[in-house]
């Protein structure tokens, strides 16, 4: 009875843990979502600014091709910056810690926010292009460090819920940008620089507030070898003094990893003991982006117009779709610990698979069957719901769970790189796929959803309510490494963990 009471106290959501989660997610993840959508509504106004600026310098307007190319560079700078940011994750979290990396990362938000806010006054579209690269770097770092930080702060029974919070704030950021981007708010000639510059507000708040919250206890004990600081951080996060059980579990993880030392990206690819973990994050991160989520949003406006939504009202319907995304991700926060990660992934990718197949049929028949455009709208909403439940929030959470401390930064670097390269690839090739395949474009994404679902069903284990050691014991058996150079493996066969009741 006493042990159960102790477990309940250790696993509760305290005010400090809740505030640390909200500040980290709002200050970092929110910006990612905001900058994804911030340039969509004012795109034509910004291109007009590019042209007027060019005219002011040369006395002539740009032709269509160079203007389109310049705008494409502006948009693509964000995922390119995200890729660069992913490569910085390992060095930053190992040098500054998880919290320190987030604080340092605010440079890549506040500086470009000022530059973008001043770009129209300065008559420089180059400032916007450079700033898009910088906010991309910010997003690349935050999309990896925030899940890592929260996953290491949370007790095991809350790790899933708190791990979904970053994705929730990404969707909130998208929705806020869509609302602020309405034409009667900031998507106008005078307002669009303010719309772009607002991304610095969450960063400034995080810079002021996050220093008052603890660093990751795992980072403090395993990497800094400061058990006293780790214990103090745990006591602050858990709201009581008796944290010896958790300290012992972290110490056990530290002992298990001493033979491995720091694991670089190159070493990560060479280690047989991590092959299924590594392959799983590559498949999940690739499947997340290559399943067509960006293409759905790209195609949504056209689908709404074909269904008879007036052109001037499409912006409101698009914001409504963003609201659905927020609501379903909010639901995922509460059901991830009830249903588990594996089931949400299977359910989410399956819904996306069916939505892509039905959408293909609806698009092919919309010219001959009058009510098919309405089916297309249902498919778009269904896809958004499915992706919000599993494919969007769960992969980053799983990277935290299936890797131990020594390999986790490098794993996030790999997962983040796959995420951003896949994002960039879809944005680059989807217009060509659409031109070549027309209404059958989404068959490509349906196939990717199917293959990812099969992989999850066959390979990915459930990690709900398990310690990091217990999860890695599952993969140790899958990788069959207990007798292959055990002194060089990240985790040897360990006796069952008895610290958690």
From Swiss-Prot:
Localization: Apical cell membrane; Cell membrane; Cell membrane, Sarcolemma
Sequence positions that bind D-fructose: 32, 167, 288, 296-298, 387, 419-420
CDD domains (UniProt xref): MFS_GLUT_Class2 (cd17432)
Residues in compartment: Cytoplasmic: 1-18, 92-98, 150-161, 214-277, 335-342, 395-412, 461-501
Single annotated GO MF: D-glucose transmembrane transporter activity
InterPro entries per the UniProt record, alphabetical: Fru_transpt_5, GLUT, MFS_dom, MFS_sugar_transport-like, MFS_trans_sf, Sugar/inositol_transpt, Sugar_transporter_CS
One Gene Ontology biological process: D-glucose import
Ranges facing Extracellular side: 40-68, 120-126, 183-192, 299-313, 364-371, 434-439
Record: glycosylation sites: 51
Membrane topology according to the record: Multi-pass membrane protein
GO CC, alphabetical: apical plasma membrane; plasma membrane; sarcolemma
The entry's keywords: Acetylation, Cell membrane, Glycoprotein, Membrane, Sugar transport, Transmembrane, Transmembrane helix, Transport
Matching PROSITE patterns: MFS (PS50850), SUGAR_TRANSPORT_1 (PS00216), SUGAR_TRANSPORT_2 (PS00217)
Domain of life: Eukaryota
Catalysed reaction, written as an equation: D-fructose(out) = D-fructose(in)
Regions crossing the membrane: 19-39, 69-91, 99-119, 127-149, 162-182, 193-213, 278-298, 314-334, 343-363, 372-394, 413-433, 440-460
N-acetylmethionine carried by residues: 1
Function: Functions as a fructose transporter that has only low activity with other monosaccharides. Can mediate the uptake of deoxyglucose, but with low efficiency. Essential for fructose uptake in the small intestine. Plays a role in the regulation of salt uptake and blood pressure in response to dietary fructose. Required for the development of high blood pressure in response to high dietary fructose intake.
Record family assignment: Belongs to the major facilitator superfamily. Sugar transporter (TC 2.A.1.1) family. Glucose transporter subfamily.
Protein name: Solute carrier family 2, facilitated glucose transporter member 5
Organism of this sequence: Pongo abelii (Sumatran orangutan)
